[in-house]
Each structure stands twice: as C-alpha cells, then as structure tokens.
C-alpha cells in the first residue's frame, strides 16, 4: 500500500505543477521543503506550503522537541527565512547556559531561604494540652458574670457579691 501511495503522489505532483524545493535538514535528520505559490490545472491559486518530512515516519514516534524551535517557527510562518545550522546550535547552547544558570540560582535561593528561615523562626514552645477536641467542655470552668447560651442550653450568669467597701458608699 505504501509504494502505491508514493507512486500516486509523484504522478499527482507532476500533473499539478507542484514543485518541492529542499530548504534544509536539521541535526535530527528531518528534511524541510518549500512549495511556492502556483496555479493548479483548474486555474486555482494554491498558496505556498512549508513541509517537514520527519526522520521517523510514524506519528506515534513523535515527541515534543523532535523539531527544533527555529524550524517550527519557519513552518508556522512566524519566521520568513529558514534557519541555518549555526543559528540552531548557537540557540541550543544559549538554552543550555540559561538552564545551568537557573539551576545555580535555584540552589543559592534554597540555601538562603534555609538560613533566613532558621534565623526568623522562634524556637518551638512546649504547649500543654487540656482535654480533647471532641469534648463539649474541658478543664475547670470558672463562673462568669455574663450569661452564656449555646444552642438549646442556657446558662445564667453567676451572682458575685460586691466588695463591702463599695457597697457602703
């Protein structure tokens, strides 16, 4: 089936006046082609095309990063001229340098944050736990002057006698 499809494509290209120019190859072996604008046999104007023939023919084997960023920009028409191999290698080297610098920065930041967090945090304080969180009340209840109400239970405030001195005045 594969060779018959290729034969049909070759026959169709010869009839449709579609000319495929080889523009370049990347370090992974992918080949890039440019097909200029042309008129087909019905007189329709077919706009230019930019095509990549992947080194691994199966779409299943494709992984992100198999096509360099510069070539991808050329295929998507965000870049007018195809990239050179020197440019791709220079940009790859630049990306590696940035990756190394960011890793160094991350390590320094980690050390600084560890030092400052040790300086800023107070030592842990021993807390005394009274009762249990699920208990409705725990510990010694002190009588309060103010009445308290929680749902259906009402607790009137307790009576506290005044000092004798303030009562006589």
Curated annotation (Swiss-Prot):
Q: Where is this gene product found?
A: Mitochondrion
Q: Could you tell me in which tissues this protein is expressed?
A: Highly expressed in ESCC cells. Also expressed in heart, skeletal muscle, liver, and in fibroblasts.
Gene Ontology terms: cellular component? mitochondrial inner membrane; mitochondrion; respiratory chain complex I
Q: What induces it?
A: By MYC. Direct transcriptional target of MYC.
One Pfam annotation, family name? Answer: NDUFA12
| Biological process (GO), any one | negative regulation of insulin secretion involved in cellular response to glucose stimulus
Q: What is its main location?
A: mitochondrion
Disease / disorder: Mitochondrial complex I deficiency, nuclear type 10: A form of mitochondrial complex I deficiency, the most common biochemical signature of mitochondrial disorders, a group of highly heterogeneous conditions characterized by defective oxidative phosphorylation, which collectively affects 1 in 5-10000 live births. Clinical disorders have variable severity, ranging from lethal neonatal disease to adult-onset neurodegenerative disorders.
**Which lineage is the organism of this entry classified under, starting from the top rank?**
Eukaryota, Metazoa, Chordata, Craniata, Vertebrata
The protein depicted here goes by the name: NADH dehydrogenase [ubiquinone] 1 alpha subcomplex assembly factor 2
**InterPro entries under this entry?**
ComplexI_NDUFA12, NDUFA12
Arranged from A to Z, the UniProt key words for this protein are: Chaperone, Cilium biogenesis/degradation, Disease variant, Mitochondrion, Phosphoprotein, Primary mitochondrial disease, Transit peptide
Q: Is Transit peptide a UniProt keyword of this protein? A: yes
């Amino acid at each position: 089936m594969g060779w018959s499809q290729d034969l049909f494509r070759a026959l169709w290209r010869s009839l449709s006046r579609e000319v495929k120019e080889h523009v370049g190859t990347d370090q992974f072996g992918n080949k890039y082609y440019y097909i200029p604008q042309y008129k087909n046999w019905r007189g329709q104007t077919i706009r230019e095309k930019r095509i990549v023939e992947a080194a691994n023919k199966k779409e299943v084997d494709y992984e992100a990063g198999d096509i360099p960023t510069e070539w991808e920009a050329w295929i998507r028409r965000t870049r007018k001229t195809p990239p050179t191999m020197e440019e791709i290698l220079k940009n790859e080297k630049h990306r590696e340098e940035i990756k190394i610098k960011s890793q160094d920065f991350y390590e320094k930041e980690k050390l600084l944050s560890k030092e400052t967090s040790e300086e800023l945090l107070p030592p842990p304080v021993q807390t005394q736990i009274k009762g249990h969180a699920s208990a409705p009340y725990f510990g010694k209840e002190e009588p309060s002057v103010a009445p308290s109400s929680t749902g259906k239970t009402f607790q009137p405030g307790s009576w506290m006698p005044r000092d004798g001195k303030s009562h006589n005045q």
